[in-house]
Structures are given as C-alpha cells and as structure tokens.
C-alpha cells in the first residue's frame, strides 16, 4: 500500500469505529490538513455531518448537540488556530460535564517549531479541560489497526465517563493528503477481518453506574428524619427522571422545594416559584431551614445562597451524579455521588408527611401583580413580559434555550409555571459565558430533533452573529428572541452602576447595529412587536410554523431597571404581609 492508501484507510477506520461507538455526528470545518478525515466522513454512508466555516461556532454547536443527545458530536478541523477556536466550547463542556470529541489534524513532526506555516503545538492544547488527550502516530503500517480501534473506543468512553467531558485526539498527517482506494486484502488489514464483516464496535464499554453509598444513605435518612425545617433545592439536572423524582418526594413529604430554571421543574405548575420571595428581605430574614438537601448542580440566582449565608443550616447535603467538588460556599456537610432519583427512592419513608399549604393564594396574588405591572396586553413588551409570555406558551413539543446574563435571570424570576410536565430548558451555565449562544442553541435543537426558542440579549446575539447561518433547518427551526436594550443591561443592576460615571463607556458598551439587517443578511424572517399583545400573537403563530425567525424586542436599560424596581416594590408588601416563615 502506498502513502495515500494507508492514510485513507487509517481515517476510514477511525470514522467507522466512532460511528459504531455511537459518535456518528460530525461537525467539520474545511481545511487542507484535515482532508483525509473530512473525506472519510463524507464517504461513510452512516455518518451524519455538517460543515462549519467557523470552528468557534462549530465547537458550541457540538456542545449544544451533546446537551440534547447525551452523546458527543465529533469536531474535525485543520491545523493551527483552527483547533484553538474550539477552546471556549471545550471549557464550557468541561465545566458542565458535557461529552465532546475533538479530532484535530496536524503537521508532521519535522514541521513543529521549525517556522512552518499554519503550525502550532497542538498536543495537550486544552490542558486540564480535557478528560483525555492523545497524540496519534502518523498513519503507517507499523501501527496495528487494532490499537487505532481501541484508542477510538477509549476516547468515546472517556468522553462519556464520570464526569463526562471533552476528549482531544491530535492526528498528524503527511502530504499528499488526497484519498486513494485501498486493498482490504493487505496483511496490515487482516487482523480486522471479523470487525470489517460485522457492524459491532471493536470493544464495547459499559459505563459504571454509581449507586448511593449505604452509609451515606443511612446518614441522610437520619438527617432528614430529624429535620424541623427542611428545604429541598433542585439545581441543574440533565435527566427528567431525576427532576420528577425530587418533585414527587417534596410533594409527598410536604417539604418546600426551590426549583431552579435549569432543573426542568421551574416551569411546571406543580412547583411553587420561590425565586421572587428570596429577593424580599423579610422572607430572607425569617427563612431559616435547619437542613438543606441540594439535588443537582448550580443555581442561576444568588439569593438563596445569600440567604443561607446569614443563617447557615445545620446540615447542607449535596446529591449529584458527579465526582467533582460542588461546594462554592464551603458549607456542605455531606456529599453523595449518585443520581438524585436513586437517592430519592431511599428517602420516601424516612419521615411523616407534613402539611405545607397556604401558598396557592399568595402566589396567585404574586402572578396577578406581575401580569398587571408588566404584562398588560396593550403595554410595551419588555424584558419581564417576554420571558413570561414565552414560558406560558411553550409546550412539550418545543424546547427552550436561554442565554446568560439578564435573560437567564428574568426567565428564572418571572416565568409562568404552567406546564404539566418538566419542560426542557437549557443554558450554558458551566462557566456562564455569553459567547457561542446561538450556535449552542442550534446544536441543541438538532440534537433534540425538536424546534427550539432562544431567548438572548443583544450583546450575546452580536457575539455569535455568524451562527445565524445555521438556522436553515426547516425540521427544527429556531425562534431567536433578542432582548435589545442597547448594551449590557445587567450592569445597571450591579453596584458599579452607582459608583462610576463611566458605566456606558466601560461596561454597558452601547451598540447601535441593526438586528433587522443582520437577520435579512442571513435570509431570516424578522419581526419587532411593540406591545405584549402583538408579541403574544406573533410568538403563538411562530410556534406553529416550521421556519426560523428573529424577533427583536426593543427596550431601554434605564426603563428596564425602573420596571424591575417598581415591580419589586409592589411584590415586597405581598411577601411581608404573608409572614410565610414568621416566628
């Protein structure tokens, strides 16, 4: 076999084994050095792939796909800065335990550190953010193909491990790079005879299941049995079964449940939306749980943690299926690595159910106040009404993706809890960046195979503008709702707003670009409703169509700040007179 044939077979073996291991979706960015990999994907009838001119966008698309599908997409790129552009998405995937596979093509050894064009040190470029990284040898008959197959299997296994995360394989290729048909009868290929005749992976990997430690469960049962004022917290959870189990236990035992937006429970009508109550000082002062059991990961809002810092509970227990430390306030007294559902099943009989009524009327008044103050039909659509309307109209046939900063906070605070079942809501909360959001949402929609709505701010929108080119899928359209307050609106809510006269110049960074022109550039439909009624009708109609759409909601940062403060002033007396936990 000549060099071209060896390289062609080498790459086709890699691609085939990836597909057999369940990693059959490829996000490819065009490049010369990655030619053998790209054409190996294109030649495989079982491979699904999409081309991305921008590697940074491709990385976030792969991240979104993994969030939805629960398995890694495979990123393929050429050498040089191409692979470096994956870095932000790799960091997010690592921080939030999302599987990802990176196959980077590289120059051969003699071109490294020799002044050769488009050549950098790519091995271990992502450092500690990968679960595994490996430099493969150059294609050659001296390397057994069986070792190549087992390496591919190991890469997929590590990506899906506990915790899941990115895996990087760096593949050097020597020119010529063009493919050439090869002979499978070659002695080098003979050990793969059975593999070639089957459709099975070279090696099957069973991911370990983490069962709750018996001693830890006994301790937790005792803690909950003796608790006088227990609180359940539902943080970010990937599996609906976990979320439903936690909600069911809280309901059956009569225990207050704080359900974060990322838990999937926040938008259900079975959970009380406590977020706004935690912003009230009277509530925060009187709320003193002695035991907190935190299921899942982090929360969007700071208020619960701030409240608990003032009156630390006697026990703070964390239950999540992740070996990493989750203890930002360093107050955790017991940490259990297991699925929340597995732990919940052991807690149902540990205490008698308690009465926890009287909240329906309170939160009905809260909802009425929000709707009157911010959501009146003929009033301008705003940054409070938009997430509330979206949450009230979206059903199980549609998914939600929410950008960080104000959209995440406002959806968490003001969403209408009307869904019968947990509604799939995703955010990039690993490191909570504002970059790559449109790309992630597009990948999430593709991985979920479901239409999706994205709620995003104007700065995040502009940050990932080229990703609008990805919204051409009629099967899974993306409705992009841009909350345009002409800059970084969140800074108006931070202490710096009152401590500098350079807020706009150094923090808010106003922009006057046309969202409409951006949408038209990418041949996307565009609308800009003025009132809540117009937005409600427009969004309800968009949910019925199989076409992507950009909806711009124009607002003003100062008006938005005033609206939030005015609404809080109207809600505070409601919580204060209720005396929920008054002693």
UniProtKB/Swiss-Prot annotation:
Belongs to the TPP enzyme family. MenD subfamily. Keywords: Magnesium, Manganese, Menaquinone biosynthesis, Metal-binding, Thiamine pyrophosphate, Transferase. NCBIfam families: menD. Gene3D superfamilies: 3.40.50.970, TPP-binding domain (3.40.50.1220). It comes from Chlorobaculum parvum (strain DSM 263 / NCIMB 8327) (Chlorobium vibrioforme subsp. thiosulfatophilum). One of its GO terms (biological process) is menaquinone biosynthetic process. The keyword Transferase applies. Homodimer. Catalyzes the thiamine diphosphate-dependent decarboxylation of 2-oxoglutarate and the subsequent addition of the resulting succinic semialdehyde-thiamine pyrophosphate anion to isochorismate to yield 2-succinyl-5-enolpyruvyl-6-hydroxy-3-cyclohexene-1-carboxylate (SEPHCHC). This is 2-succinyl-5-enolpyruvyl-6-hydroxy-3-cyclohexene-1-carboxylate synthase. It catalyses: isochorismate + 2-oxoglutarate + H(+) = 5-enolpyruvoyl-6-hydroxy-2-succinyl-cyclohex-3-ene-1-carboxylate + CO2. SUPFAM superfamilies: DHS-like NAD/FAD-binding domain (SSF52467), Thiamin diphosphate-binding fold (THDP-binding) (SSF52518).
